[in-house]
């Protein structure tokens, strides 16, 4: 079978399943064996979409590194808008790999910045990712500086949707311990006026924690009850479910916390 046969089989069984991923990886091997760059790119693009939903960032990173090399080689046609959009996925996920140094992370983000400038894209996504990374790395002064750049940068079609932007703002306020402001920022998400495929799924866990910190146990419980239904057993929402576990332990719901933790451990790829 050639690469396209494997990709067709993956589509038949469902690309965003473990079996689908296995077949896509077979497609990549077949394409590389035949030195078929176009098929190899198409298969890796398919793999990136599948692993994004399945929570497999390492596979995603390896596929993207190859795709970027082909993009820079300029041997085949590549949709730069699509590839640069996927750059955001990789950049946000790379901080979770302990084996990747800060210098390597900085190099990747500098490359992203230069490519965005080259295509005359807004740097708003770049500065937002930098802000989120500084939050993850415990660099409060950098967080403040980078957020100012994020807020000041112009918007364009490479920006995330309004619901995702609001979600990130909620996380920013929670990071700074301003729980009331986090809740206030989230009103449009709680009401459903702003939503997308990932939000408020990503937001409910941190909101449960924020409400608990504010002493509103009823609202916190409601966020868990409604929110976990959206994210239960889904690998792409493991971080949100980790927030729910934190909420359950903070509120001393030990049995429920253990139940959720055990269920989500089974989801890990």
Predicted features and spans:
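Helix-turn-helix repeat elements of alpha-solenoid scaffolds
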Residues: 13-26, 55-69, 97-111, 134-149, ...
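Extended alpha-helical scaffold segments
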Residues: 124-130, 134-147, 154, 163, ...
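Residue-level signature for tetratricopeptide repeat
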Residues: 9, 13, 30, 50, ...
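Long, ordered, amphipathic alpha-helical scaffolds
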Residues: 242-269
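Flexible inter-repeat linkers and adjacent short helices
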Residues: 1-104, 254, 261, 269
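Alpha-helical adaptor scaffolds
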Residues: 206-215, 232, 241-246, 252
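Generic helix N-cap/helix-start motif at coil->alpha-helix transitions
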Residues: 1-7, 40-42, 84-87, 119-128, ...
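Solenoid-like repeat scaffolds
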Residues: 29-36, 68-77, 111-121, 148-160, ...
